[in-house]
Amino acid sequence: MSVKPTKQKPGEPPTTGHSWDGIEEFDNPMPRWWLWTFYVTIVWAIGYSILYPAWPLINGATNGLIGHSTRADVQRDIEAFAEANATIRQQLVNTDLTAIAADPNLLQYATNAGAAVFRTNCVQCHGSGAAGNVGYPNLLDDDWLWGGDIESIHTTVTHGIRNTTDDEARYSEMPRFGADGLLDSTQISQVVEYVLQISGQDHDAALSAEGATIFADNCAACHGEDGTGSRDVGAPNLTDAIWLYGGDRATVTETVTYARFGVMPNWNARLTEADIRSVAVYVHGLGGGE
């Protein structure tokens, strides 16, 4: 409870008037150094709000008298970095792709720069370790749809795959054999069993024998007579154990029925030539480059 102080010894400061179980609190003034510190912070805050950007407005904020901007600082740092690396980046652009590996300094720069570009733009689909995911190719192995040499990788990164924003994008389109009525369900089952056979999986031998003819008539034009695929049209090898969407019976049936149509952006619309070359060198050096 709060009561009016009634007792005060000579020389003692007054109390606050609060008494809790007989315990009272002196009403001592704050130390002078604390008050002056408080006043200084007020002056500093006023000065800061005048000199630096501080107060939000409807369409922006106050700029401050000295015009300081952390964004401008970052932009200056970026420009300074670009200027410092301008020579080697120009060298990277001017050097033949196949000759970059012969220059240790250039190769190291391209690999490091490419890793940064990859982490910023490519990991969303291909994964942070470049091992890919369902529908997104693994870049660590030597199974390439469009070619794994440095020039082929550069072309793929530059123009992309099946996009509508680059006339030179790599393009191929698998027919929807089931959805468009090109094959009936029995024929699809037969050709699926044949694909399982040539890929070394458990299969129905009788259905596979029928599927061989269907494969030759409908699939061999792209995947080859032996099913090993064709890089000219981005047709995958069906005889190995590497599958972009899955190699089990149900998934292969779905692929034959509805087809697949993966798309990759053309990075020449977003990255510089030096960046594209850097990431091509990086991907080529991951282990599966040819």
UniProtKB/Swiss-Prot annotation:
The gene is ccoP. It is found in: Cell inner membrane. Binds 2 heme C groups per subunit. Disulfide bonds: none annotated. Component of the cbb3-type cytochrome c oxidase at least composed of CcoN, CcoO, CcoQ and CcoP. Residues 1-37 are cytoplasmic. The keyword Transport applies. Its cofactor is heme c. This is Cbb3-type cytochrome c oxidase subunit CcoP. The chain crosses the membrane at residues 38-58. Residues 59-290 are periplasmic. Belongs to the CcoP / FixP family. The lineage of its organism: Bacteria, Pseudomonadati, Pseudomonadota, Alphaproteobacteria, Rhodobacterales. GO terms for molecular function: electron transfer activity; heme binding; iron ion binding; oxidoreductase activity.
